[in-house]
Amino acid sequence: SFVALVFTTSAFAKEVTLLMDWFPQGNQSGYWQAEFDNQYHDDVTIKVKSGGPKVNTTQMVASGQVEFGLQASDSVMMANAKGAGLKGIFVSLNHVPYTLVYHPNTGVKSVKDLDGRPFAVKMGVTYWKWVKQKYQLNAVKEFPLTGDLGLFARTPQQFQQGYSLFLPARLAAKGVATEQITIEELGYRPYSVLFTTDKMIKENPELVQTVVDRLSISFPKSLIDPKPTRDFILSKSKKVNAEIHNNALELMKRDFLPKDWSKIGCQDPNRWVELANQMK
């Protein structure tokens, strides 16, 4: 009946916001695709919001300003240690593509050879605390990452944090040769995970499940036909061109996503245990 129809749409037609971990970039393609696909769904309207260096994603979700956020699983655990009450619901990368990029032919044979050098880093980032402790890098001269690739290009001894999906390719496009040590190969591998609050899961389980279901559709779609999300992301980013973006998607498919795309989003509880032990 008409009354029943009104009831069902009002019960489920809801708008939710997914706050990203950074400005629009290729590893977020499946999330942006979900927003583009709102026209095909009448269950939930998904709005995706850009992050950035001044955006505290875990805080925004924990305080209820947005419903969902994308962040590294170690950041989620750090927030939970302060009582945030957050839970990962959808893994979009098997590990965050943190990498340490350095100049070739500067005497680096292992991560220990980076000790004593200047390092452009996002101050306070959790993986670096672990790397420093694990590999005894006590003399590194840390300074805040600004995104100025020119400084790196001019400073042979410097190394820099970035995403392996983008930073080496961006530097190569500027004619700067690099080598890298990924944080994953050093043994630290937090998920890149969409999360929400325990409260949201308890009070709106159908809504949370609907968002997960929508993402399970949008992620493979964004890989099969990457043009819509690529055009959008390139329109928002001056730092990445089509070649760098396409290369990032190929790296994602090779190293960061399950070979069976129907398993994108799935998580292994043991990985959270592994990470918790590393963060002690």
Where are these regions (language model features)?
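Short, glycine-/small- and polar/acidic-enriched structural segments
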Residues: 14-145, 149-162, 181
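Sec-dependent signal peptide recognition
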Residues: 1-4
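N-terminal signal peptide c-region/cleavage motif recognized by signal peptidases
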Residues: 8-10
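Periplasmic-binding protein-like
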Residues: 92-101, 172-200, 212, 251-255
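Glycine-rich beta-alpha junction loops
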Residues: 24, 166-167, 185-187, 236-237
